[in-house]
Regions:
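Subset of outer-membrane beta-barrel
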Residues: 20-186
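Bacterial Sec-dependent N-terminal signal peptides
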Residues: 1-22
Length: 186
């Protein structure tokens, strides 16, 4: 390859692979992360993930599992006001492919609903206080397989995102992730 073309590719290509760095504030709960080991390494496991938690980090890593795997995580935020829960299950289909499922929930429970606190006569009635929850959910399903070369793995992840804020509001969303891993063992 000519040096000028190589220089151009090295200059332009990194602009397209910054998908992990782009953030917005919608569904920010999906950026918290899973797996204590991965979080302890400052989330630098995208290229090396090869277990059930690959459904979150890089679905291509699911090809690395040999047997059924499960993962459960719980974390409390803001002195226990908010809770983050994660559960995942993965299994190999054959030597070349695997499938996984996961659910993530980030929620605040037992929020006081005071919209009915004052009755029609303007009196405060504490019996009208009720509780509600505000929660975000992500349901994921992933498939991964070895491609033409045994060293090249490909994975895809489809997710459905659900937000529920008591009886006041709810919404649905969806997304897709794709990942590749190349491992060269000489």
């Amino acid at each position: 390859m000519k040096p000028k073309i190589l220089f151009f590719l090295l200059l332009v290509f990194p602009q397209f692979i910054s998908a992990q760095a782009f953030r917005n504030y919608s569904n920010e709960f999906l950026n918290i992360g899973v797996d204590a080991a991965a979080l302890g390494m400052s989330k630098t496991v995208v290229a090396t993930s090869n277990n059930v938690n690959s459904i979150y980090w890089n679905p291509a890593g699911l090809v690395g599992i040999d047997d059924y795997q499960g993962s459960i995580m719980h974390a409390s935020y803001f002195a226990g006001i908010a809770n983050y829960n994660y559960a995942a299950f993965a299994m190999p289909i054959d030597k070349e492919s695997a499938v996984a499922f996961s659910i993530i929930r980030f929620g605040v429970d037992d929020i006081l609903n005071t919209t009915e606190l004052i009755d029609n006569q303007g009196n405060i009635d504490f019996n009208n206080i009720s509780l509600f929850s505000a929660a975000d959910y992500a349901f994921n399903v992933a498939y991964a397989r070895n491609l033409i070369f045994k060293d090249l793995k490909f994975g895809v992840n489809a997710k459905v995102v659900r937000r529920i804020i008591g009886d006041f509001a709810s919404s649905w969303g969806f997304g897709f992730d794709m990942g590749i891993q190349f491992e060269r063992n000489d």
